[in-house]
Amino acid sequence: MSFLKEFREFAMRGNVVDLAVGVIIGAAFGKIVSSLVADIIMPPLGLLIGGIDFKQFAVTLRDAQGDVPAVVMHYGVFIQNVFDFIIVAFAIFMAIKLMNKLNRKKEEAPAAPPAPSKEEVLLSEIRDLLKEQNNRS
């Protein structure tokens, strides 16, 4: 089998295509959640706390010196990213919970036990014959 043909079969397998679609949708969803947190949730939260913009929270570790920029730790951006993570994790949790609920509905009734094999039928007949002989004696 040629390398290209083998790669094409691999790439067109359902799981790989599903994974690619999931990654693309996940990236787009991440942008939406980031915008939701940065533009919708954090401004009112900052206003409730006292007009604070979380993006501005930072600690300067070293001031700028000449052409060397300052070393700054932006922990406000980190707080915003934590909110992003919590919202994404909650959305994924809810999606999985919904999928599990739908899968439970699709579960089939327990399958009927399989028919006895030829050996089991034969052994049952022998057992019944032996019982019959013992009852006659």
UniProtKB/Swiss-Prot annotation:
Stretches that traverse the bilayer: 10-30, 76-96
Matches recorded under Pfam families: MscL
Bilayer disposition of the protein: Multi-pass membrane protein
Subunit-structure text: Homopentamer.
Family that this chain belongs to: Belongs to the MscL family.
InterPro entries: Mechanosensitive_channel_CS, MS_channel, MSC/AndL, MscL_channel
Record's keyword terms, sorted: Cell inner membrane, Cell membrane, Ion channel, Ion transport, Membrane, Transmembrane, Transmembrane helix, Transport
GO molecular function, one term: mechanosensitive monoatomic ion channel activity
Name the record gives this protein: Large-conductance mechanosensitive channel
Predominant localisation class: membrane
Record-linked HAMAP family: MscL (MF_00115)
Subcellular location: Cell inner membrane
Protein function: Channel that opens in response to stretch forces in the membrane lipid bilayer. May participate in the regulation of osmotic pressure changes within the cell.
GO cellular component: plasma membrane
